[in-house]
UniProtKB/Swiss-Prot annotation:
Binding-site list for phosphate: T123, N124
Domain of life per record: Eukaryota
Domain AB hydrolase-1 span(s) in chain numbering: 259-531
GO cellular component terms listed in the entry, alphabetical order: cytosol; extracellular exosome; peroxisomal matrix; peroxisome
Outcome following mutation: R287Q: No effect on phosphatase activity; decreased epoxyde hydrolase activity
The protein's name in its UniProt record: Bifunctional epoxide hydrolase 2
Gene: EPHX2
Enzyme class, UniProt record, top EC level: hydrolase
Cofactors demanded by this protein: Mg(2+)
Impact when changing R103C: Decreased phosphatase activity; no effect on epoxyde hydrolase activity
Subunit field text: Homodimer.
Reaction(s) the record says it catalyses: an epoxide + H2O = an ethanediol; (9S,10S)-10-hydroxy-9-(phosphooxy)octadecanoate + H2O = (9S,10S)-9,10-dihydroxyoctadecanoate + phosphate; 12-phosphooxy-(9Z)-octadecenoate + H2O = 12-hydroxy-(9Z)-octadecenoate + phosphate; 12-phosphooxy-(9E)-octadecenoate + H2O = 12-hydroxy-(9E)-octadecenoate + phosphate
């Protein structure tokens, strides 16, 4: 029968070095008889302290003194003396903190899941009630999102190698034994699975195990391109709504804990445009709030043009923070979201912990030239003139939403729409294919998410962001001479042919603490086009410049 499920042990397989490998390493370091600590670990067999720990009958802090006593008894039997400073707690604290995700093994699991395999973790583990328990929580939180099932011995009251846990596994997978491959680093844990008819792989080193896994599955797992970062499934996310004024609410998706980071998308997009950044930033230790900007998705979309001027939008973002009890947040924007976050830094610097923009530069207002004059002088912005008349662009963009998003969401090395002479041509899509090919950046399922979102909101609200040029200019002129002094990041994309990198060349004159990132071979849709590079740049900057300062009570 064909394999269709892959099961991975945690300790020694998905996470290295194995925690319980510390027993042998400690024996060697302290010149103790070989096997002494392992004997103490297994003392009592099915009724012993370790089995009770793994079944969740006692916690790790309860187990530690029992293990200390077992070590003392075993050392007396062996007629050896343990060092005076011998501490099982210290030994296991260090071993647990040293354990990291085995990335090649995780990548193999991701590849198998992508190819249609059901994946699971089957682990003997414990209830961790130590002061240092957050490390295990972080490890499990990151791993869980990549697997269909997680079976923890301490939660189900069964342990490997007891036969019943393997039957429980098969019931959970809804699979027959011959459809399952199981990887573990302990031979005794593999035997019952093999006796049932599962394919088993003993993991002694990762490369050898993956070669064997390749062989039994027929799927290439080694020397493959690095996978895309973890994405978001909209139905699995936590969705929130904040009413910022009567009849206007903002929708957001939230993940993670730590300093707040507000992600602000551009036109014509969605919170979902940050789908590759949300898990990465959350895993890096931030509370991510990915916005549906006003006019989009599940946020309110009032029809009035003035509802979308920057002054109103920024005031509403401040109210959003107020309603969530956030004194400050990091603001990261792209496209129009980038424009908004620069305005937040200018007019509400006390509420902005740090600010970053992808593609959109900060350019101070020119009091001697209105923005419409500037746009008319630059042919690449001709499409923005086409967007000015209410109803015209809406009709074209809403006519066939699938065509709209497939035409717009293109990588820089694919055929892209020209933004020149849009008014003269009478539309964005004139002479473009009725059925555009799908970009390598997106899947059909992702395109359909945008289609469904814009069926709800339409394009009037999103286009109204373009129809406040004069209002935004007059407001911006109030900040003439003002500098942005908070931590800031500008990320340019080499092949964005509208927001070209050269537009950002004088930003240091106005933002003295500006840091920069640059992504080569990247077009306008930066988060989708180069998600790995975006994540690396953002996390490095956040960790160095955007961690919250200590909170001092004013009570």
């Amino acid at each position: 029968m064909t394999l269709r499920a892959a099961v991975f042990d945690l300790d020694g397989v998905l996470a290295l070095p194995a925690v319980f490998g510390v027993l042998g390493r400690t024996e060697e370091a302290l010149a103790l008889p070989r096997g002494l600590l392992n004997d103490a670990f297994q003392k009592g067999g099915p009724e012993g302290a370790t089995t009770r720990l793994m079944k969740g009958e006692i916690t790790l802090s309860q187990w530690i003194p029992l293990m200390e006593e077992n070590c003392r008894k075993c050392s007396e039997t062996a007629k050896v003396c343990l060092p005076k400073n011998f501490s099982i707690k210290e030994i296991f604290d260090k071993a647990i903190s040293a354990r990291k995700i085995n990335r090649p093994m995780l990548q193999a699991a991701l590849m198998l899941r992508k190819k249609g395999f059901t994946t699971a973790i089957l682990t003997n583990t414990w209830l961790d009630d130590r002061a240092e328990r957050d490390g295990l929580a972080q490890l499990m939180c990151e791993l869980k999102m990549h697997f269909d099932f997680l079976i923890e011995s301490c939660q189900v009251g069964m342990v490997k190698p007891e036969p019943q846990i393997y039957k429980f596994l098969l019931d959970t997978l809804k699979a027959s034994p011959s459809e399952v491959v199981f990887l573990d680093d302990i031979g005794a844990n593999l035997k019952p699975a093999r006796d049932l008819g599962m394919v088993t792989i003993l993991v002694q080193d990762t490369d050898t195990a993956l070669k064997e896994l390749e062989k039994v599955t027929g799927i290439q797992l080694l020397n493959t391109p690095a996978p895309l970062p973890t994405s978001c499934n909209p139905s699995d996310m936590s969705h929130g709504y904040v009413t910022v004024k009567p009849r206007v609410r903002l929708h957001f998706v939230e993940l993670g804990s730590g300093p707040a980071v507000c992600l602000c998308h551009g036109f014509p997009e969605s919170w979902y445009s940050w789908r590759y950044q949300i898990p990465a930033l959350a895993q890096a230790g931030y509370r991510v709030l990915a916005m549906d900007m006003k006019g989009y998705g599940e946020s309110s979309a009032p029809p009035e043009i003035e509802e979308y001027c920057m002054e109103v939008l920024c005031k509403e973002m401040v109210t959003f923070l107020d309603k969530l009890g956030l004194s400050q947040a990091v603001f990261i924007g792209h496209d129009w979201g980038g424009m908004l976050v620069w305005y937040m830094a200018l007019f509400y610097p006390e509420r902005v912990r740090a600010v970053a923009s992808l593609n959109t530069p900060f350019i101070p207002a020119n009091p001697n030239m209105s923005p419409l004059e500037s746009i008319k002088a630059n042919p690449v912005f001709d499409y923005q003139l086409y967007f000015q008349e209410p109803g015209v662009a809406e009709a074209e963009l809403e006519q066939n939403l699938s065509r709209t998003f497939k035409s717009l969401f293109r990588a820089s090395d694919e055929s892209v729409l020209s933004m020149h002479k849009v008014c003269e041509a009478g539309g964005l899509f004139v002479n473009s294919p009725e059925e555009p090919s799908l970009s390598r950046m997106v899947t059909e399922e992702e395109i359909q998410f945008y289609v469904q979102q814009f069926k709800k909101s339409g394009f009037r609200g999103p286009l109204n962001w373009y129809r406040n040029m004069e209002r935004n200019w007059k407001w911006a002129c109030k900040s003439l001479g003002r500098k942005i002094l908070i931590p800031a990041l500008m990320v340019t994309a080499e092949k964005d042919f509208v927001l070209v990198p050269q537009m950002s060349q004088h930003m240091e004159d106005w933002i003295p603490h500006l840091k920069r990132g640059h992504i080569e071979d990247c077009g306008h849709w930066t988060q989708m086009d180069k998600p790995t590079e975006v994540n690396q740049i953002l996390i490095k900057w956040l960790d160095s410049d955007a961690r919250n300062p200590p909170v001092v009570s004013k009570m």
